[in-house]
Amino acid sequence: MYNPFLTFDFSYNKCFLSGKATNTSLTQIPLLPKWLLKQAELSGDEQIKLLDESIRSYSSLELPIDTSLNNEFLTPLEQKIEKAFSTGYAEVSKLEENDLFIWIGKFLYGFVYAEMNAAIKAEGTAAGLNMSQSLIKRFGTHQFFLQKLYSDLVFENFKPWSIAVVELADKNTPFSFRDEINTLTFSMKFKDFGIVACLQDNGTNAIFHQEILKEIEGKALSAEQFEELSARYYYSAYLFNRLPDYTIVPLKETTFIENMPLRGAFDKPLFDVWQNKVYGQVLENFLKPWGFTLFEIIKDPEKPMSFFENPCLPTAG
């Protein structure tokens, strides 16, 4: 099991997915695929701020990958996602969740890898990095799950993710994405589709939001509605108070992964109490383009602003 978080080795002379370290067989690939920039009509010069406050252009962010792994496994996945994205919701909604999980997970982990590489370079050593053991475990597990791209990993009767793919009313929605690294939560919108994903929750967020997901089934969401749905996922991912644990069973060429019961010895619910005021602060951030204030959002503390006819909000504490 390759786990760079055990040694904090995020160098660019080894594959970021497999850990193979042979300079002659490494390829540098863009973190944001060229096909995605092309579809989004972006030049690659657009800038993004990393956690260390440095400003980088999209095109300057690259990742080292084993050439054969890239050609045999990653490129076919990229081509599958590219084809679906080019069509829009009709095809994106048909993608296997496993493929979306690997693609989104690679995208998100790519930022983590680049961030860690930059941080260690700046410090000159990994000794000064301050990362909790729970976060190290979460990231290490996520990286291991991504090895499903090129090895036979089997999730035994569970999915480690919650992924929602929704249709957007605006068929020409510009490409944008956001993420929360600590909770491995990701969302993006593009053309006529939106995706919200929690990558290590064993499907609990999908269950937590099942009422609103059922309510919007078959409906195209407005831009405000998609941001509201995203805000709910980001907030509930924050409230999720378990660190999933797994049993790994190698058997010949296959590795079986079993999820340990989330409840364990704990009696308390899997999610901390939903607080409308805190949720309102999250929603305010997601609704910035429309200028709604926190006061407007929680004017009625019992019924926060919602763009859904039937809000289906979780019960607040």
Describe each model-derived feature in a short phrase.
Residues 1-84:
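An N-terminal structural lobe/cap that precedes and organizes the functional/catalytic core
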Residues 13-19, 88-91, 174, 182-184:
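Intrinsically disordered, low-complexity boundary segments flanking structured domains
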Residues 15, 31, 104, 186-188, ...:
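Generic structural hydrophobic/aromatic packing signal, biased to beta-strands
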Residues 129-317:
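C-terminal, charged low-complexity interaction regions
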